[in-house]
């Protein structure tokens, strides 16, 4: 479970945020971004000593000042349930495109390819000098016009 997915799921729920300087903020999570910056509503801020309290309509907390986050257990359970259902839906690798080298010759509607240039394998003869009729003196083959 990733912290950002947990925070995205916790939107609208109450949470406690403790900062590195010791202050705590209790409020409802409105939003968070990829740097874990947090926007809270209906916030009660408690000083480091716990002797002063402030009520604020909303608050923005920078992500790199956060030491601790407490989210409700129901949010954690919901995220774990979503992760489990995601893994149950399809096994890893199903539905993904294969890499270039992983082509299967038995693919439906495809002819197997030759093994290389100029080989007598039924495939194309390549673009080298002289084609199949170059030595017999006929037209074609060769690089010149004549």
Swiss-Prot record:
Start and end residues of each stretch annotated as Disordered: 80-146
Record flagged with keyword Ribonucleoprotein: yes
GO biological process, one term: spliceosomal snRNP assembly
Biased composition (Gly residues): 137-146
Start-end of Basic and acidic residues biased regions: 80-91
Gene Ontology CC entries for this record: P-body; spliceosomal complex; spliceosomal tri-snRNP complex; U6 snRNP
Sm domain: residues covered: 2-75
Places the protein is found: Nucleus
Purpose: Binds specifically to the 3'-terminal U-tract of U6 snRNA.
Family, similarity comment: Belongs to the snRNP Sm proteins family.
Subunit structure of this chain's protein: LSm subunits form a heteromer with a doughnut shape.
Protein name: Probable U6 snRNA-associated Sm-like protein LSm4
Lineage: Eukaryota, Viridiplantae, Streptophyta, Embryophyta, Tracheophyta
């Amino acid at each position: 479970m990733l912290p950002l997915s947990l925070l995205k799921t916790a939107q609208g729920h109450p949470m406690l945020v403790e900062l590195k300087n010791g202050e705590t903020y209790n409020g409802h999570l409105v939003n968070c971004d990829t740097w874990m910056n947090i926007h809270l509503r209906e916030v009660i801020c408690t000083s480091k000593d716990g002797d002063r309290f402030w009520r604020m309509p909303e608050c923005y907390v920078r992500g790199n000042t956060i030491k601790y986050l407490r989210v409700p257990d129901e949010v954690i359970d919901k995220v774990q349930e979503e992760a489990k259902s995601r893994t149950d839906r399809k096994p890893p690798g199903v539905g993904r495109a294969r890499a270039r080298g992983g082509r299967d010759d038995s693919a439906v509607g495809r002819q197997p390819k030759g093994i290389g240039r100029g080989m007598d394998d039924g495939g194309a003869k390549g673009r080298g000098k002289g084609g199949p009729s170059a030595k017999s003196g006929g037209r074609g083959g060769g690089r010149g016009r004549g």
